[in-house]
Structure formats: structure tokens, C-alpha cells
């Protein structure tokens, strides 16, 4: 087998592993899993590392299992959390499970039948019929409270000021541990992977497998590092909050812009983590970028690869066109091809004014539009001078002083874009 661990190390995707893990992965095709708790109806780019890890696993000939925590999601993982999580109601949880299934299915084909075909499971399916007494006898008996108390996630919560930790969250590591035992027994799963903050929960699982699996039972663990920005700040958030993997929560345009605005240092790091480009290709891109940083070769390639991976090539092309409207050459047709939501995102922060649809239906001379109707320019004189200098455009098309604004100039029957010079924009919102 090709060495998966070596691949993860040069990509910056490796943090730690249990002894014997690398040997197991190079010896034979191995089944491994990663869990995703349904705390929302989508996943954000922070979860991309784990999804990418599952894809690498499959590409190296191993069998990936994606586990959705329908049961653990009812409890809430205390790892890295300072406060108790609010419990989700069943309807919300079911909606979230369906949403995460859809996201994972866009990266891994769970319908293939080859030997290392990915599997999608939900731990609610094997936990729902477990009575409390049965769980306490069969699972709780195998792990001591001392062992559970030694975990960092527990220590931090019990040592911090506040409410401490409920019994519900305290049992989380036991339920996650049993997931590993169940998958070991039913799918011959030998490895659990996850973020470095999951080490405590994962090793509870390896311990449970060894204690319940009998003589010779093997279980391994591998974790990825916490991804941060070059300045040490948390990765995965923009000014508007989380960057999600579904367009209903983060538009493709905003997703595209997030990656395009990556710093040079971060781009060099992220292109190894978030793309499947090989080492020679990436090394070549890094060298090319160093010779001409202003061309942003790394950022553009990173953005292109990850936007195609998450949203597809067609959506990438739309995002590029949308970006060119504000930052490059574009036409009136490009502008009119935008939906209303993308139009507003592109021109977010651009000055706006409302204008009466009745006025536009009657037709308004451009001088009046630029001054009295919008306040875009300070006076009729300034408007006429700008028009004489050929520096005024309506919807990306240059106009003269004789131009009359009418309903045919509306974008999405709602907007008109005014422009003075190269960079001064103004949006008319037709009401």
C-alpha cells in the first residue's frame, strides 16, 4: 500500500497517531471512520479537513466510513467547549442529519459497490434501542470513571469557573467510544480519525475496542492539526461568520471571495491541505508565485480547485464573472445575468438610494438621475462635466448627457448600477 501517513505529513494534515497506525495503513486496505455531529443542517469549511481526509483515505485504497452522529448530536460534544450546549429537538436534528448527508454525498459516492466503496452510517440506528440499564451494564462497566476524568475535555470543564459538566455531556465520550466498537464489530473498522481536539474521545474508543473485542483486538487512532491562519486566528470564519459548504448558507460568490482573499502564507499552506494537486504541481506553483506575488497564482489556483470541488465548474465560472463585474472587465450582459442576491452581495457596501418606479417609467434624464434623484454626484454641473469626460456608465455601458433612464435599464426589475470613473459605484434600488 502507498503510505498515506507520509502524504498527510507533507500536506500538513497530520498531528498525531497511535503506535502501529502507520504500519497498519501500509500493510493492507484498512477501514477507518470519522464522525460528524449534526449541530447544523450543513457543514462549514472547518469540516473540510475531515472530508478531505476521507477522500485521501479512499484514494490510497482504504475504505472510508462517514458517521453522522444522530445519537451523539442529541447530547453535544464537550471537547473544546466552555459551556454546555443547548439540546436540539428531534425535528431540528432530523433536518440537520439530512443536510449533512447531502453535503457528504457530494464528496463521496456512497452508492458504489467496489471493494473500498465509502459507507455512510448514523449512530442513532444502533443507539436508539439501547436502554439505559443495558448501556450502563454492557458499556459503562468497561471504562472507569478515573479514565474518563483524565480526559482534557473533562478536566477543562470541571476546572473552569461556571456550571461544570452535566452527566449527559460526561457520557458523550462513552457513546462515541461505543461507535468505534460497533463499527469494529460490524464493519471491521480498525481506525478512527478526527481533529486533534478529538484525541480523548477517540482513545476512549480504542480502549473500548480492546476491552470488548477479545484477545488480539486492534484499534488505531490518527488526528489532524487545528487549522489556523498565519496570524494565529481561527480558520473558517469571514466577517459574516462561518463559511459554509452549501450555497443556501454561503453564496458561491462569497465562498470564492473568501479563498481568493487568502494571504500569501496561508495560500501556500491551504493549497496543500484543501486540494488534491500533487507535490510537484504545488511546489511549482509556490515557486511561480514567489517570482510574481502580485499575480496571486497560489490564491487563484487554490480558489479554483476548492470552488470546483465544493460547487462544481459551472458555479466557479459564475463566481469569476461576478468578481470581474466589480474588479475587472465586464459587460452589461454579465451584469444582467446576475440574480438579485448575488448582485446585492457584489455591491454590498456600495452607496444606494431608492428611486420611484413611476419616475423611471416616465423616463428620467441622466443628469437628474446623477444628482437630484440619487445624490451620487453633488450638482448638475458636476454631472454634466463627468458626462462630457465620458466617465459615466449605466449598467457598465457609457452614456452621454442625452441618455434617458427607463424601465428597460433595470436589472432583475429592481436595480440600476451607476458608475463614475473606474471605481466609483452607486446602486439605484427601484421601488
UniProtKB/Swiss-Prot annotation:
Gene: tyrS
Compartments in which it is found: Cytoplasm
Family affiliation: Belongs to the class-I aminoacyl-tRNA synthetase family. TyrS type 1 subfamily.
One Pfam family here: tRNA-synt_1b
Main location: cytoplasm
EC class of the enzyme, as a word: ligase
SUPFAM superfamilies, per the entry: Alpha-L RNA-binding motif, Nucleotidylyl transferase
Motif extent ('KMSKS' region): 234-238
GO CC term, one of those recorded: cytosol
Binding site residues for ATP: 237
InterPro entries: aa-tRNA-synth_Ic, Rossmann-like_a/b/a_fold, S4_RNA-bd_sf, SYY-like_C, Tyr-tRNA-ligase, Tyr-tRNA-ligase_bac-type, Tyr-tRNA-ligase_bac_1
GO terms of molecular function: ATP binding; RNA binding; tyrosine-tRNA ligase activity
Source species of the chain: Flavobacterium psychrophilum (strain ATCC 49511 / DSM 21280 / CIP 103535 / JIP02/86)
Chain location of the short sequence motif 'HIGH' region per the record: 38-47
Cystine residue pairs: none
Stored NCBIfam families: tyrS
Subunit (UniProt): Homodimer.
Residues binding L-tyrosine, per UniProt: 33, 172, 176
Catalytic activity: tRNA(Tyr) + L-tyrosine + ATP = L-tyrosyl-tRNA(Tyr) + AMP + diphosphate + H(+)
Assigned keywords, A-Z: Aminoacyl-tRNA synthetase, ATP-binding, Cytoplasm, Ligase, Nucleotide-binding, Protein biosynthesis, RNA-binding
EC number: 6.1.1.1
HAMAP family listed in its UniProt record: Tyr_tRNA_synth_type1
UniProt keyword annotation of Iron-sulfur present: no
Transmembrane parts of this sequence: none
GO biological process, any: tyrosyl-tRNA aminoacylation
Protein name per UniProt: Tyrosine--tRNA ligase
Keyword set includes Ribonucleoprotein: no
Domain S4 RNA-binding: 364-431
